[in-house]
Amino acid sequence: MTPTPDAPAAADADAATGAGWLARRRGALARVALAPVAQAIGRVERVADGIAFVSGLEDTMLNEVLRFEGGVTGFAHTLDEDLISVVLLDPDAGVRAQTAVARTGAVLEVPAGPQLLGRVVDPLGRPLDGGAPLDAAHTLPIERAAPAIIERDLVSEPLDTGVLIVDALFTIGRGQRELIIGDRATGKTSLAIDAIVNQRHSDVICVYVAIGQRASAVRRVIDAVRRYGAPERCVFVVAPAACAPGLQWIAPFAGFSIAEYFRDRGQHALVVVDDLTKHAATHRELALLTREPPGREAYPGDIFYVHARLLERAAKLSAALGGGSLSALPIAETDAGNLAAYIPTNLISITDGQIVLDSALFAANQRPAVDVGLSVSRVGGKAQHPALRAASGRLRLDYAQFLELEAFTRFGGLTDARLRAQITRGERIRALITQPRFRALRTLDEVVLLKALAAGALDAMSPDLVAPLRERLPAWLDARIAALTPALAPPRDWLADDAALDALAESVGELIERIAADAARRATAGMPAEDAAGDIGGAFGGEQARGDADRDADHGANREVSREVSPEASREVSREVSCEVSHEADRDAAADAARVAGRAPGRAEPDRAAPRAMPDGPPRAQADGDRASASRPRPDARGDAARTAPSPQGGADANVDAEAEARHKR
């Protein structure tokens, strides 16, 4: 017989069951979305230039999305007592007076997430590359609050751009806002795209925002990143000049929201805004159309606040929030180099530094045309790699002194040897920081180059040979490191070993000798000299500028070092190789110097004409060789003559060798 529970226990069980059922019912009711029975409908009073003035929607929120009859959308830009100024985000062909308008209760949002990587979208996340529509499962408002002070951390990690003058003198840190400013067509976008392309070997997600740009210019940027960079980790937010002003206005905010998705998850992101000058012009246009009171240069009074609240969203988050970072490279355009204009001064005061590009330097074929006197990074050495900071300690001072001395040398020559040495050092620095597009340097390459410069290894070489040195150095260092690394050895941090860096910097002297020998051999054989600037074909087709033959020769020299990994054996083999190269280079350079000496201005004219008057023989062949070599392009004939000018006895021997070579050619 089964015992029955007593009456009090049964009552407690029934009460518990009833309470649970009631809690479940209340939860279900709370999850029910209740829609209003009645919805307010407004009417368009007038529409013009992408702005619709709507009445009857007094409860509309600022920046709320409104939907017009026919599917056109817009957002509330200004709220007056009687009218709402709505900025249209679509073509206004279907919006006319008395068109019905309804509230949505939502603010502007943009899709965010990994599905955006590699895509070209508009500021609303709509594809522009012909791909599939994006999944809108995760969206973010385009207007988000900047991180609070307690949520930020110090900027202490470098954002490597691969551009020597930027990394060495104006270091950009992860979480920093560095303004790129200059006149039109001075290479502002090129410098920013170089920074994006250099992130192909890093963990940085890049977002490029184009505002009011030509479609052809945007296409060139996208093609450059796809060809040279890592497009699978880039997002392109495009609001071209032909689109609605509303899309151009929200474009930078949408780009920052997309980048913040990755920053909030502990990743690192970089946003390039191209450019904020056009964004300011769009904001002024919308303000004047909505009859806001104009201020300085007809800009509304809130233009500073608009850009400040945008750029303040770039930050380095604290470790408690994941340690992610969002760096910003806004671009601004000046008029005739006027940095004191309204928008440039606003942006300079908002950002953490500026890189000023000068049109005169650009016209002088210096790429990038960075004005070292006006450029600054307010983070600087705090985020710079210790080895690079130590190697670039005197670079800015030496270059500034050179620019000052160069200005004085235009009025007369210098007789002081110390001043001439400074001029020589400055010319090499200028050649070193002149860097073509898409020729990014690693931090190791930059440190070794600067150490070799500080040691005086570049003082004896022609400035025309600095560009080939910069081009061939990465492959040379890779081969040298591979030769000096034992098999199955763990990876070595070469940047943390000062002795190893000094050894690599000393080995640059061998590469300089090879480059000088190759230049002399090319001049003797009549081959065109290597392009000093290295910018062949502009944005495209420049990857062939670095000669395959030069790389093969460098690898062949370093392959000898791999026989012994000890430093003593490496130095011995390097000396043997350099001796062979130097012997061959001396022979070729002597013959080349003889030809140069034959064409020197100080040589008597009868001496040049006498061999041509002879009927036949070696002197005539020598004269023919002189005429042929004079018609060929030469890198720096005067510099070659100065470096290889022989003694009288050596000059006679060189003439004999040159005559024998000419006779052999006949």
UniProtKB/Swiss-Prot annotation:
Annotated region (Disordered) at 527-666
Residues reported in the UniProt entry to bind ATP: 182-189
Supply one GO molecular-function term.
Answer: proton-transporting ATP synthase activity, rotational mechanism
Q: Where does the UniProt entry say this protein principally localizes? A: membrane
* EC number in record: 7.1.2.2
Q: Which InterPro entries match?
A: ATP_synth_asu-like_sf, ATP_synth_asu_C, ATP_synth_asu_C_sf, ATP_synth_F1_a_nt-bd_dom, ATP_synth_F1_asu, ATPase_a/bsu_AS, ATPase_F1/V1/A1_a/bsu_N, ATPase_F1/V1/A1_a/bsu_N_sf
The protein's location, in the record's own words, is: Cell inner membrane
Biased composition, Basic and acidic residues: where in the chain?
A: 545-590, 623-641
What does the annotation say about its assembly with partners? F-type ATPases have 2 components, CF(1) - the catalytic core - and CF(0) - the membrane proton channel. CF(1) has five subunits: alpha(3), beta(3), gamma(1), delta(1), epsilon(1). CF(0) has three main subunits: a(1), b(2) and c(9-12). The alpha and beta chains form an alternating ring which encloses part of the gamma chain. CF(1) is attached to CF(0) by a central stalk formed by the gamma and epsilon chains, while a peripheral stalk is formed by the delta and b chains.
Q: What is this protein called?
A: ATP synthase subunit alpha 2
Record organism: Burkholderia pseudomallei (strain 1106a)
